[in-house]
Amino acid sequence: MTVHAKVKAAFVEAEKAVKVTVAPGFENDADANAQWGTTRALIRNMIEGVTKGYEKTMHVVGTGWNASMAGKNLKLTVGLANSIVMPVPEGLTVVVDKAAGEITPVKISGVNRQAVGQFASAMRAKRKPEPYNGKGIKYAEEVIKRKQGKQFGA
């Protein structure tokens, strides 16, 4: 991993820890302090990704809408004329649970937090949830604020 010039990262064998420090001469530099926090968070995310892994669950919601795996590609049938085929990036695992009903859960997992989030975001961007019928691709924990729609006979 490349580290900013104002930040030093080193593995301390005796403590079995990674120490991230601001380089000498830059202790009062606001940019160096910001880079220190970013570097520390990136290293923490790498360690957590290797030990526990990251997972996001997406829901494909809609009548007749579903997701399936076709080899190493995710195939989304979401109310368009053609199915959307998304290649799964290297290092990610996508599992589609075939559930009865209108919700199809899709689990995205991997060791790289950024890659998991980016693939989930790209999947959601194909068909964002809409507030009137609730159809779309959404995060499992996401709550869609519903709207009433037209009123007749005012």
Which residue stretches match the model-derived regions?
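Ribosome-associated RNA-binding proteins
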Residues: M1-A154
